[in-house]
Curated annotation (Swiss-Prot):
Cross-referenced CDD domains: IHF_B
Protein's UniProt keywords contain Transmembrane helix: no
Function according to Swiss-Prot or TrEMBL: This protein is one of the two subunits of integration host factor, a specific DNA-binding protein that functions in genetic recombination as well as in transcriptional and translational control.
GO cellular component: chromosome; cytosol
Molecular-function GO term, any one: structural constituent of chromatin
Family, as annotated: Belongs to the bacterial histone-like protein family.
Gene, per the UniProt record: ihfB
SMART domains: BHL
Single Gene Ontology BP annotation: regulation of DNA-templated transcription
HAMAP family linked: IHF_beta
UniProt keywords, alphabetically: DNA recombination, DNA-binding, Transcription, Transcription regulation, Translation regulation
Organismal lineage: Bacteria, Pseudomonadati, Pseudomonadota, Gammaproteobacteria, Enterobacterales
The protein, known as: Integration host factor subunit beta
């Protein structure tokens, strides 16, 4: 599901709320989540999961075109860990 599809589905379920208000709310929520992670904070949504940053250590990679070795710097990457309720709901299809 894309962000546009999410907005469309939520707007369809909330007929009393204008679609533009739903779009603004979704965009604001995602922006706030990104800013929170950028500040190094963890986000926990009970029953759904948690978002945090994981550190990737510096390493030697390879240029896929030339095969040359490339030094890659260490960096933080977003990480999502699903909560138990979400894992259980997803496993009904597995």
């Amino acid at each position: 599901m894309t962000k546009s599809e999410l907005i469309e589905r939520l707007a369809g379920q909330q007929s009393h709320v204008p679609a533009k208000a739903v779009e603004d709310a979704v965009k604001e929520m995602l922006e706030h989540m990104a800013a929170t992670l950028a500040d190094g904070e963890r986000i926990e949504i009970r029953g759904f999961g948690s978002f945090s940053l994981h550190y990737r250590a510096p390493r030697v990679g390879r240029n896929p075109k030339t095969g040359d070795k490339v030094e890659l710097d260490g960096k933080y990457v977003p990480h999502f860990k699903p909560g138990k309720e979400l894992r259980d709901r997803a496993n009904i299809y597995g």
